[in-house]
């Protein structure tokens, strides 16, 4: 992971150094602080903005090297479009856009956080800083040689000039911890599977003790004693033993039921005996994207001292095809006592989640529970890579997730759950089977999971299309996106934190 950019805040009166970044609207007007910083170069800049195709449209950029009359070495103008059309999420995007423009810049960068009509608010300035950090991320720790044309990392010292430094720092502090959580999740998803196997994943999750998270790690012996036959069946073909990690953050009122988050952590998925085709199998190192998100989220909640009690639980396995591997036709007994016939060993994630969901439901009795999993290819057929699939037994929780998804840009789309689908996973020999056939694959997977949550308000997010390999964006150029950390942090902040 490369996160070498340093972001700080300074007053408007600070003289710009190195690269100067300013904002203008679609009328090509600048704010007072920007105009003052431009000084004698204002005429040159004005001519450039009027003769170029720039037009000041939202997120458009104009790059001018060493404009006459400007003490800075380089000027970047970022368009903010119409003031009436601005949204809160635009400032995160602008941070990403300008970080993309200064990538490879190893010097000083000064960003004037001002629109033509007014200075950016502390929250807007904080979003700008977050966007810079998120776009600056690069995972290249295993590259020993760099080629010409390789995307270069951002090593600059970025100072954001603001109207109120103290207020901007205060606004950015929690956001900065959320960005750290996203970077943790991205790192985990990007790691190769020979490095990040279940035991190593558990070890990395245990680093959250540093920010005050309580950690319990269940080994195979402990899970066997608990009766986690569904999870253990998935991992029995691997030389790497399975693990379940429980993370606890107690920031709310003592005794108040927690919010709970459960993640699928298949550290590598060959498909098992029902083996996948070779093409693209290397991407199955990312089949633990749900677990990665939960670890990143728990870091964010603890580091920003969220006023909530929260539990994160991740089931960590490898799905491998050796002589001891699970077979189609096997019947496993889950921790709940319900039996599951294995039809396809490549429908393994729901087996892992079934036991962890049941464990969390019974042990912690959460007020709400959300699981995340790169669960089905079917959700990508339905929704592509722009929305995660949302399945829930609770309308209020669904509405809240949809709302914060729009706010954060990590969008979800509600999919159906209904008793009529249950017949698709009926088994002749067990209580259910682990796959329902060709049609409605993401729905039947969620129908199975629903049987392991009792009456807990619960949502299942199928993030197969958004956690890895999703289209690059203004704030993410990484294969592993860290999807879900901002979404769920916002859910907690808006609806479940104690207001004091």
Curated annotation (Swiss-Prot):
Reactions catalysed, as given in the entry: Release of an N-terminal amino acid, Xaa-|-Yaa-, in which Xaa is preferably Leu, but may be other amino acids including Pro although not Arg or Lys, and Yaa may be Pro. Amino acid amides and methyl esters are also readily hydrolyzed, but rates on arylamides are exceedingly low; Release of an N-terminal amino acid, preferentially leucine, but not glutamic or aspartic acids
Residues that coordinate or bind Mn(2+) 1: 269, 346, 348
Positions annotated as active site in the UniProt record: 276, 350
GO molecular function: manganese ion binding; metalloaminopeptidase activity
Cofactor: Mn(2+)
EC id: 3.4.11.1, 3.4.11.10
Pfam families in the record: Peptidase_M17, Peptidase_M17_N
UniProt: Mn(2+) 2 binding residues: 264, 269, 287, 348
Keywords: Aminopeptidase, Cytoplasm, Hydrolase, Manganese, Metal-binding, Protease
GO biological process: proteolysis
Function: Presumably involved in the processing and regular turnover of intracellular proteins. Catalyzes the removal of unsubstituted N-terminal amino acids from various peptides.
Assigned protein family: Belongs to the peptidase M17 family.
Name assigned to this protein: Probable cytosol aminopeptidase
